[in-house]
């Protein structure tokens, strides 16, 4: 292969690789479908029920703080409210589905919603403190986002409802190489792990029960083939750059 043909081959190689490593717009658009001015999608109602090893914040208060102080955990001093301090000061649901509250004792909470737990505790506490107010919050709502997102890691949400879109938003959204059609949701189950494949380009995802995340879920965003092609292009570029330099040196030596 003479010099002219060689350079032509190099040019065509880079041109072809660049074209095939480009990402079509259709691959990065969420919830694709026919464009409408307004669309209503009915969603499945999601209410989280407490599981073993969840962590709850339970606060029992009344106008007379001295009366209800005995019902609460002695708080560990902390200047900042963070997941670590809330873990220390929270109630961990044991494997039997119970939490152990001062004065009250063990109360079954597994299988109940936060509102139902609040009602149960109100009934117990108000037999002794008629004007008591009970606040129950879930503080172990954390999910892990991995793969092709801009800010992978563990993210916390202090709310009863946490959607896949909210989780991806907290992770900085998918990168340009995140495969919208290949989202893997890993959900811990008793005795194992449930794995579900989700497609962000499909509007029907909004109707799915998996649109709502649960504590300890792991979301993995797979890369597009274009990222692999890009990485291969970098390797090929380095190789051919070195090869081109070598050919030029050899031609220079031969011409002198």
What are these regions (language model features)?
Residues 1-20:
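Sec-dependent bacterial lipoprotein signal peptides
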Residues 2-4, 22-256:
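Ser/Thr/Pro/Gly-biased, low-complexity, turn-/loop-rich segments
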């Amino acid at each position: 292969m003479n010099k002219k043909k060689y350079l032509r081959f190099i040019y065509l190689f880079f041109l072809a690789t660049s074209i095939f490593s480009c990402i079509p717009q259709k691959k990065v658009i969420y919830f694709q479908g026919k464009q409408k001015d307004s669309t209503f999608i009915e969603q499945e109602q999601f209410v989280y029920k407490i599981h073993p090893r969840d962590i709850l914040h339970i606060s029992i208060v009344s106008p007379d703080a001295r009366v209800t102080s005995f019902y609460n955990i002695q708080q560990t001093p902390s200047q900042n409210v963070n997941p670590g301090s809330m873990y220390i000061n929270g109630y961990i649901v044991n494997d039997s589905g119970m939490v152990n509250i001062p004065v009250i004792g063990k109360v079954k909470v597994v299988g109940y919603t936060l509102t139902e737990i609040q009602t149960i505790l109100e009934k117990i506490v108000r037999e002794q403190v008629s004007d008591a107010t009970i606040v129950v919050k879930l503080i172990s709502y954390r999910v892990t986002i991995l793969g092709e997102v801009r800010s992978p890691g563990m993210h916390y949400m202090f709310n009863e409802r946490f959607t896949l879109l909210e989780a991806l938003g907290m992770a900085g959204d998918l990168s340009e190489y995140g495969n919208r059609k290949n989202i893997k949701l890993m959900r811990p189950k008793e005795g194992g792990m449930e794995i579900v494949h989700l497609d962000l380009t499909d509007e029907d995802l909004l109707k799915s029960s998996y649109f709502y995340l649960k504590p300890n879920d792991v979301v993995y965003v797979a890369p597009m083939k274009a990222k692999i092609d890009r990485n291969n292009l970098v390797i090929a570029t380095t190789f051919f750059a070195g090869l081109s330099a070598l050919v030029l040196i050899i031609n220079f030596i031969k011409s002198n």
